[in-house]
UniProtKB/Swiss-Prot annotation:
The keyword Amino-acid biosynthesis applies. NADP(+) binds at R48. Pathway: Metabolic intermediate biosynthesis; chorismate biosynthesis; chorismate from D-erythrose 4-phosphate and phosphoenolpyruvate: step 7/7. It comes from Halobacterium salinarum (strain ATCC 700922 / JCM 11081 / NRC-1) (Halobacterium halobium). The gene is aroC. It catalyses: 5-O-(1-carboxyvinyl)-3-phosphoshikimate = chorismate + phosphate. PROSITE patterns: CHORISMATE_SYNTHASE_1, CHORISMATE_SYNTHASE_2, CHORISMATE_SYNTHASE_3. This is Chorismate synthase.
């Protein structure tokens, strides 16, 4: 099975299955000299782990990370960083009815059709359990960016559950209030309504979808390459990799289809050097607005990158549904029991942030904004052929 690696210079390779012994991730391309310890990784994993509240799965995984390599005396060495997380509360017995009878709207049959076999416990490799690895990698990327000369900050919050939509909130409000409630919505009144809606679906044995607003600030202009390595193309790939993602938008997103060109086009103006929302020096040209979401021509403008990603309702629900045993051809009525989330966005917030951190850092390394060998080394201008020469360190 391929497709277990992403990133060009900051390369993340993951392994593990939902009900296997554990999960693991290897991060290659992290510069040497970054202060890093297990607590920094654990803080992010604790935001994603199951069993946080009544609106998450009750699976009791502590998600304790163990760093196996890549550190010396609390600093990265530039060698691969290996991290493992044990699975301690798997219950595979409830999945035995689906060994040859696929659960509706899961990857059970498609995996079996492709590979001729699969690990059926908990969905195996197709489970969202896999995202624990991504959050661990994202914590490493976050540490690199925080200790670099660039003030890159990424935040996200749940902005819609079902038909309940939060009003627009500021980046500062998201930073300060997105963790104030179990839904991870930065608007407290909306969060209460969202929580009640999730509870209602859960009590009825059903589930509900939603969306997450994300924003990255401090990203310098000029990152990305045309076409297939554009920033929106790579960010879109990273976010669509999250299980159950149905759409990803930047800037105006789908609303742009009903906006005239003159209205959406943004005039250019001159930076006065005091803007706190854009990376620009005094006298630099900057867009007068940001309906493009910090991206023009697939390349960063220095303005905030923002957008929205949506998820469908979780497919594991205790409702009677129809399936077919692919060995016997028998039609069956099945009920998916077990422990599952009634709505995905509350736990997906740290996953979204992690994928943005990983992808943005990769672009920063490719674009020569951060030395790929050592954090205290001189940046340089590299080609985007993924094999840059090391810069001179004087």
């Amino acid at each position: 099975m391929n497709g277990n690696r992403f990133g060009r210079l900051f390369e993340v390779t993951t392994y593990g299955e939902s009900h296997g012994p554990g999960m693991g991730v290897v991060v290659s391309g992290c510069p040497a000299g970054v202060a890093l310890d297990e607590r920094m990784i654990q803080d992010e994993l604790d935001r994603r782990k199951p069993g946080q509240s009544m609106i998450t799965t009750s699976r009791g995984e502590p998600d304790e990370v163990s760093i196996q390599s890549g550190l010396q005396d609390g600093y990265t060495t530039g060698t691969p960083i290996g991290m493992t997380i044990e699975n301690k509360d798997a219950e595979s017995g409830k999945y035995e009815p689906f060994v040859t009878a696929p659960r509706p709207s899961h990857g059970d049959y498609t995996y079996s059709a492709k590979f001729g076999t699969r690990n059926w416990g908990g969905g195996g490799r197709s489970s969202a359990r896999e995202t624990v690895n991504w959050v661990a990698a994202g914590a490493v990327a976050k540490a690199v960016l925080a200790q670099s000369d660039h003030d890159v900050r990424v935040k996200a919050h749940v902005n819609q559950i079902g038909e309940i939509e939060a009003p627009d909130v500021s980046f500062e409000d998201i930073r300060e209030h997105s963790e104030d409630n179990e839904v991870r919505c930065a608007d407290p009144e909306t969060a209460e309504r969202m929580r009640a809606l999730i509870d209602d679906y859960q009590e009825r044995g059903d589930s509900i979808g939603g969306s997450i607003y994300f924003e990255a600030r401090g990203v310098p202009r000029g990152l990305g390459a045309p076409r297939f390595d554009s920033v929106p193309a790579r960010l879109g790939q990273a976010l669509f990799a999250i299980p159950a993602t149905t759409s990803v938008e930047f800037g105006l997103g789908r609303d742009a289809r009903s906006v005239a060109g003159k209205q959406r086009n943004e005039d250019w103006t001159v930076a006065d050097g005091d803007e706190d929302h854009v990376v620009a020096d005094e006298g630099d040209p900057i867009p007068a607005g940001n309906d493009h979401g910090g991206l023009q021509g697939g390349i960063t403008t220095g303005e905030p990158i923002y957008g929205e990603a949506s998820w469908h309702a979780p497919t594991s629900i205790p409702k009677t549904q129809a399936t077919v045993d692919w060995e016997t051809g028998e039609e069956k009525a099945v009920t998916v029991t077990g422990r599952h989330d009634p709505s995905l966005p509350p736990r997906a917030v740290p996953v979204v942030e992690a994928m943005l951190y990983c992808t943005i850092l990769d672009f920063m390394l490719l674009g020569g904004r951060i030395n790929p060998d050592r954090l205290d080394g001189h940046p340089g201008q590299y080609d985007t052929d993924y094999h840059p020469s090391s810069p001179r360190n004087e």
